[in-house]
């Protein structure tokens, strides 16, 4: 009846094990409305100058500067030696060229030169041009050499490995001639394209007269766009050749393929690197040029100006040569991490280092 106790089992404690704490080793589940303590993903491994994942623009540029900080003896030593040789040769060439021009000046001023004098003047002008051209060619070769050396240092530095000059040269030596061939092929191709473009514009001018202005502008603009497009697509051909050990044509194909879908990004990074190197060069050369101008004001000799030009070339080269090459090398590595998941291979290489510091970059057939 009313007020009687409930039947047995009603309201009693639950059976053993029901609602009790779990046995040791089992975690309790979170209550309703509670969330598990999710944290941020672990950072990407960074054994060297950049993290092993697709890079942001700032990380790429900072990595180029970090190359100098990570191995200053080798990087700055190579840059100093190569820049010194280039500066000395170009300074001598400029001095000899100016001396030839001084010798030709009296004939040009008189205006009454004989045929023999005009011939001598033309020969002097040709000698002046050659005096500047030959050092410029050697300086170009030295720049190609520096680019290859610094690209190798970048590839090793990404994995946290520091190479000395001998190790770097041993890796580059069998790739130097192909690297020179690649540079010449691209340069000759660009020169030929410009020559064809100029020939078309001149032909339009002869054929259409004043009406050739608009077609000529269209040809010039179209040719310039095509050259810039090809330059960006081939921007990482040198790193592909040096690091992967492929041939000249294969390196151009590799660069063209890696830049697919990233053309605007590659262009932006190249422009940004160019602006930075230009600013660095200006900061270095302007004070030297000002001092040389003041020194020239107290002397009629051109020697202070020539020496200042050589010194500016030397100092600017020490800074800009490794930075420019490092940007190109890191851009190549970044493109491969984005398209080919190279970062996974590099992580494995960091765990199991090999005698060849660039072995992780070789593509497996």
For the regions a language model picked out, list residue spans one by one.
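N-terminal membrane-targeting/anchoring modules of bacterial envelope and secretion proteins
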Residues: 26, 31, 37-111, 115-119, ...
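Selective recognition of hydrophobic, aromatic-rich stretches within alpha-helical transmembrane segments
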Residues: 37-51, 125-164, 211-251, 303-339
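Intrinsically disordered, low-complexity Pro/Gly-rich regions
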Residues: 1-51, 354-365
């Amino acid at each position: 009846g009313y007020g009687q106790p409930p039947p047995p089992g009603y309201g009693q404690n639950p059976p053993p094990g029901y609602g009790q704490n779990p046995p040791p080793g089992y975690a309790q589940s979170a209550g309703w409305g509670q969330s598990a303590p999710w944290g941020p993903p672990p950072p990407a491994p960074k054994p060297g100058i950049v993290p092993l994942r697709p890079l942001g623009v700032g990380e790429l540029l900072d990595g180029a500067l970090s190359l100098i900080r990570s191995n200053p003896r080798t990087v700055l030593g190579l840059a100093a030696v190569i820049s010194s040789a280039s500066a000395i040769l170009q300074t001598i060439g400029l001095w000899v060229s100016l001396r030839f021009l001084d010798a030709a000046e009296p004939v040009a001023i008189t205006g009454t030169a004989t045929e023999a004098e005009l011939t001598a003047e033309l020969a002097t002008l040709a000698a002046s041009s050659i005096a500047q051209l030959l050092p410029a060619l050697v300086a170009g070769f030295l720049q190609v050499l520096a680019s290859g050396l610094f690209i190798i240092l970048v590839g090793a530095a990404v994995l946290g490995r520091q190479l000395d000059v001998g190790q770097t040269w041993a890796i580059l030596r069998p790739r130097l001639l192909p690297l020179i061939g690649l540079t010449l092929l691209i340069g000759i191709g660009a020169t030929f394209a410009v020559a064809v473009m100029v020939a078309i514009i001149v032909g339009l001018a002869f054929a259409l007269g004043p009406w050739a202005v608009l077609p000529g502008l269209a040809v010039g603009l179209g040719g310039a766009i095509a050259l810039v497009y090809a330059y960006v697509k081939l921007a990482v051909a040198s790193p592909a050749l040096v690091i992967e050990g492929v041939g000249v044509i294969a390196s151009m194909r590799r660069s063209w393929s890696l830049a697919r879908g990233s053309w605007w990004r590659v262009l932006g990074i190249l422009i940004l690197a160019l602006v930075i190197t230009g600013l660095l060069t200006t900061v270095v050369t302007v004070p030297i040029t000002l001092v040389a101008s003041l020194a020239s004001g107290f002397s009629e000799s051109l020697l202070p100006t020539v020496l200042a030009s050589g010194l500016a070339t030397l100092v600017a080269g020490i800074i800009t040569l490794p930075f420019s090459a490092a940007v190109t090398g890191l851009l190549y590595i970044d493109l491969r991490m984005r398209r080919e998941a190279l970062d996974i291979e590099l992580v494995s290489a960091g765990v199991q280092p090999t005698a060849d510091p660039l072995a992780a970059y070789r593509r497996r057939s």
